[in-house]
Amino acid sequence: AASGVATNTPTANDEEYITPVTIGGTTLNLNFDTGSADLWVFSTELPASQQSGHSVYNPSATGKELSGYTWSISYGDGSSASGNVFTDSVTVGGVTAHGQAVQAAQQISAQFQQDTNNDGLLGLAFSSINTVQPQSQTTFFDTVKSSLAQPLFAVALKHQQPGVYDFGFIDSSKYTGSLTYTGVDNSQGFWSFNVDSYTAGSQSGDGFSGIADTGTTLLLLDDSVVSQYYSQVSGAQQDSNAGGYVFDCSTNLPDFSVSISGYTATVPGSLINYGPSGDGSTCLGGIQSNSGIGFSIFGDIFLKSQYVVFDSDGPQLGFAPQA
């Protein structure tokens, strides 16, 4: 039975986490995204100017084309990509998926053209939301799941230092105490779970649902919760240019916690200072609005405090404080 460890590395301010993946012999740096289910890569089919600064996949070298298959995906931040589809061998942390669908980009939006840190995405949500037509394809995890020692993966993202994706096993050295599991509703293709209540600084409130999303930088919550949090941060104000609430960089921030099946997951205030806002004097908050989408997004700001097990048996999520 297989298992493996892949190291993720944050970019500046922990904006995204990059992990090396070998596809048909070429190693690309991909953003692992538990909020989507497409494995797409920069390819030699893109205009040469858009390949600049990237490792690119050359499908004609090792790939086998799925004739007539196409894909097109758009993300919550407005970015998008599309192209055609090949199968190839894909290796992550020593675990290899044979005949894995690899979505070769032929068009990418400006956001991806400008981001030279990543060479594509590796989706780890449920395969039901894979965008390949006419027939959706399985994610890397779903392809290898049956060969793993346990049908799960786990993630530890860290602040400005490398972390891990563990495939097929749980590394008890990466967390303290014991894991608390909670059920997942995957009807929309996401790792969605419920929190029973939350505490923002000195104020508390009722629970809500959210998704565990490694591909989102911030912790995105209902407006009422966000305003309640920043009402406790002196001098905090909305700055639409910066992307939400900002505050003086020296401000001490309150903690934010959620109760999950009896376990309290706490994001320390120090992690809620995302980094410089870009205006030269303030910092951007790591908690921001979910734009009224009806659920919360537990992105990297939240995940940095936890070791999280994504278990396809159930399915369920396991949480414990990072060691």
UniProtKB/Swiss-Prot annotation:
Q: Name one GO cellular component term.
A: extracellular region
Among the GO biological process terms of this entry, one is:
proteolysis
Taxonomy, superkingdom: Eukaryota
- Can you state which reaction this protein catalyses? Hydrolysis of proteins with broad specificity similar to that of pepsin A, preferring hydrophobic residues at P1 and P1', but also cleaving 20-Gly-|-Glu-21 in the B chain of insulin. Clots milk, and activates trypsinogen
Cellular localisation: Secreted
Q: Disulfide bonds, which pairs?
A: 249-283
Q: Which Gene3D superfamilies match?
A: Acid Proteases
Which residues carry out catalysis?
Answer: 33, 213
Query: InterPro entries per the record?
Result: Aspartic_peptidase_A1, Aspartic_peptidase_AS, Aspergillopepsin-like_cat_dom, PEPTIDASE_A1, Peptidase_aspartic_dom_sf
A GO molecular function annotation here is: aspartic-type endopeptidase activity
Per the UniProt entry, the Enzyme Commission number(s) are 3.4.23.20
The main enzyme category here is hydrolase
- The protein's role, per its UniProt record: Secreted aspartic endopeptidase that allows assimilation of proteinaceous substrates. The scissile peptide bond is attacked by a nucleophilic water molecule activated by two aspartic residues in the active site. Shows a broad primary substrate specificity. Favors hydrophobic residues at the P1 and P1' positions, but can also activate trypsinogen and hydrolyze the B chain of insulin between positions 'Gly-20' and 'Glu-21'.
UniProt-recorded name of the protein = Penicillopepsin-1
Q: Whose protein is this, by species?
A: Penicillium janthinellum (Penicillium vitale)
